[in-house]
Amino acid sequence: MVRGARQSQQPRSRLAPRLSGTVEKPPRKRKSRTEFTLKETMSSGGAEDDIPQGERKTVTDFCYLLDKSKQLFNGLRDLPQYGQKQWQSYFGRTFDVYTKLWKFQQQHRQVLDNRYGLKRWQIGEIASKIGQLYYHYYLRTSETSYLNEAFSFYSAIRQRSYYSQVNKEDRPELVVKKLRYYARFIVVCLLLNKMDVVKDLVKELSDEIEDYTHRFNTEDQVEWNLVLQEVAAFIEADPVMVLNDDNTIVITSNRLAETGAPLLEQGMIVGQLSLADALIIGNCNNQVKFSELTVDMFRMLQALEREPMNLASQMNKPGIQEPADKPTRRENPHKYLLYKPTFSQLYTFLAASFKELPANSVLLIYLSATGVFPTGRSDGEGPYDFGGVLTNSNRDIINGDAIHKRNQSHKEMHCLHPGDLYPFTRKPLFIVVDSSNSVAYKNFTNLFGQPLVCLLSPTAYPKALQDQSQRGSLFTLFLNNPLMAFLFVSGLSSMRRGLWEKCQEYLRKINRDIAQLLTHSRSIDQAFLQFFGDEFLRLLLTRFVFCSATMRMHKAFRETRNYPESYPQLPRDETVENPHLQKHILELASILDVRNIFFENSMDDY
């Protein structure tokens, strides 16, 4: 993840950046353990000459592999964060060394125990680094299968209690390693929707933090407590609980399943473009986040991924499997996660994605950010006259008055204006803007004739829903989990599993019908159909129509700014205000016994 927030002046935990999977800065270089391991052995176990040559070589080889693995792992942080080719060979070498190291310590455990003094927490460190490698590889490739591999190694550390003896040693830096392991494990579990494991880990982490701060006079207690608060808020962000008959919570997955996207009708002619790259940008003030991943970013991330499959056959017996250099088929679009990026950071990653975009492919830009509104008056209506969304600033505004006066005649610098995206419309571009100033992107101009669609959130919500904004945007929730969003606007906070599954089945029917409305429309802009061949984009489009139709029928959504918009505009009478779709929404409301909060005949009420 890109961490533009490092320059942010908002108070935040210094520990949080290390939770995103980014490689930590290595400590000051020390002499190799190889140089003095045998001398230590002599002093504790007899003369050096008494050590068999084979065992001496085993320790030497292990120390070499350990030092080499650390060197390669620390080098990961120097790799460019953008681009998809520069880093693959380095990752291959790193995986190769860790494969040898892991197998070597398994095969020679007794010798290493006796001659090297190998401790269980050191084995845990190796396993933790391997888990981090798989997590890094997931961030680089967006292949969710590698998350399962990271989970495999992190689980083994916990199940085998590799870190259990750390608390008995008077070394706070070892305890911090253990705490960071927990934090990374929680991130992986969140991404895999293993919420039951997350809750157990949070409890264990809380106990570990309490013990750590009690035993050592530390200065980071507040920061670790902030980590706990962040993850607690994150796992409670969903506004609706699905319950089993015994009142246990059902964990729902929002990744694309095999039958998730509505199928195209036989013979239907749509574009053959495929989603290849996505920039997911989060810069909302005060939104719940964990490990530099806001709730909105998390939800959009999952909306652009397929259900993961295991790479290894045995999850509880971790064995390293090196990622293939050339996967036969990319399951998921490649993604960059940018948390509070500066304008230059955002533009750098955008340019890298644009440069490497394959032929017949689409670049998606998702913006979840605070709106920036134009200051002063403007005689024109150009792409820099409507404001945009906020980008992060590198420094404090020292002279606020001077900045304010300058802004009366100049455009806001720390803002992504619609005009900033014009150069990238030379290739197919799909934009989703979730912001209080999303309408700034409504007046796009398609200069180059390439497919271009913008899905724009409402700029305001009814007062009853405004207090929930910290838990994520309603618009993004509709794109990620439309049924949960529908339940939320209907005032429902929990539901039995059986009813949930019944509603999901009906919603799949609604999505199929929406797909037909779009493909059968005679007046729809062809840009929408150009993107319709891709499963991810097709699902986003049908969910957008469902979201817009629901809000237009809901009695609480009465202002124009409460409705989503798009560029190009959709033909309302054939899509979001289609009587057939409105009937479906009323039927869904009837199943949930909330029909009274929707207009029976919305067309007559406008």
From Swiss-Prot:
Modified residues (Phosphotyrosine): Y64
Subcellular location per the Swiss-Prot or TrEMBL entry: Membrane; Nucleus; Cytoplasm
Keyword Transmembrane: yes
A GO term from the CC aspect: nuclear membrane
A biological process term (GO) from this entry: DNA-templated transcription
Residue numbers spanned by region Disordered: 1-53
Chain intervals with Polar residues compositional bias: 1-12
Domain of life: Eukaryota
GO MF annotations, alphabetized: transcription corepressor activity
Primary location recorded for the protein, binned into one broad class: membrane
Chain segments annotated as transmembrane: 472-492
Region feature (Required for interaction with MRTFA): 71-173
Entry keyword set: Cytoplasm, Membrane, Nucleus, Phosphoprotein, Repressor, Signal transduction inhibitor, Transcription, Transcription regulation, Transmembrane, Transmembrane helix
Tissue: Expressed in most tissues tested with higher expression levels in brain, spleen and thymus.
Ranges where the record places region Necessary to inhibit MRTFA-induced SRF transcriptional activity: 1-212
Quaternary structure note: Interacts with DIAPH1. Forms a nuclear ternary complex with MRTFA and SRF.
Protein name per UniProt: Protein SCAI
UniProt source species: Mus musculus (Mouse)
Taxon lineage: Eukaryota, Metazoa, Chordata, Craniata, Vertebrata
